[in-house]
Design a protein with these regions (language model features):
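Non-catalytic alpha-helical scaffolds and adjoining flexible linkers that form interface surfaces
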Residues: 1-211
């Protein structure tokens, strides 16, 4: 079978058979792919660590006959979430699931790959709040899907919003002024701080967002 090299991060894994694992891997060059890692659940397997959730590795893969390529070699690059920290593990898991659900298979998108890797890295960084990483990734993914919410003008009447709290509604697609919020039963109040976080995330400046 022909082989190829790629860098990937594990989004999902499922035990298969007596000793194998089926992996969902997000790669920079090939997008989201399915991989089978044979024998990795056996004691002493060289590749076991490379099949951990959120692990990032340089992989050598053999083209499979079906939908799954075969993991043959791997070299760890980084990103293994500290699962002992429940909050960090939970945020990393949601980031991985978001990427898995949103991204189509075999559609390379290096920018989205970097977004996911950065979010997972922040989830493992003791100096970062993992919830902020999750909000950042969610906001950026929404933008890339074309569903960016209106954050500066009222999504209903288009009136510029003052620097005060406002009301968010998914139905209208953004923030509402006080006058329009009364007519929407599904609104959620957002504080000034939350609105600022959303606006910084929308600007796409990761360095500013992490401050």
């Amino acid at each position: 079978m022909p082989t190829y090299l790629t860098e990937g991060v594990i989004l999902r894994r499922v035990d298969y058979g007596e000793a194998d694992r089926v992996l969902t891997v997000l790669t920079r060059e090939h997008g989201k792919i399915g991989v089978i890692a044979r024998g990795v659940r056996k004691a002493g397997s060289r590749l076991a660590a490379h099949t951990d959730l959120f692990a990032r590795s340089r992989m050598q893969l053999a083209r499979g006959r079906g939908e799954l390529d075969v993991l043959t070699q791997a070299e760890m690059v980084g990103l293994t979430a500290p699962l002992a920290d429940a909050r960090r593990a939970a945020c990393a898991a949601v980031c991985a699931e978001l990427a898995d659900r949103v991204l189509e298979s075999h559609h390379p998108d290096p920018e989205t790959f970097d977004l996911v890797v950065d979010a997972l890295r922040d989830c493992t960084d003791a100096a970062r709040d993992p919830r902020a990483a999750l909000v950042w990734l969610t906001r950026r993914m929404i933008d890339r899907l074309g569903y960016a919410p209106q954050l500066y003008d009222c999504a209903s009447c288009a009136t510029p919003l003052p620097e005060t709290s406002a009301w968010f509604t998914a139905i209208a697609g953004g923030l509402l002024c006080d006058g329009c919020a009364t007519s929407d039963a599904g609104v959620v109040e957002c504080s000034v701080r939350v609105i600022k976080v959303l606006r910084v995330a929308a600007a796409g400046n990761a360095g500013l967002y992490r401050r």
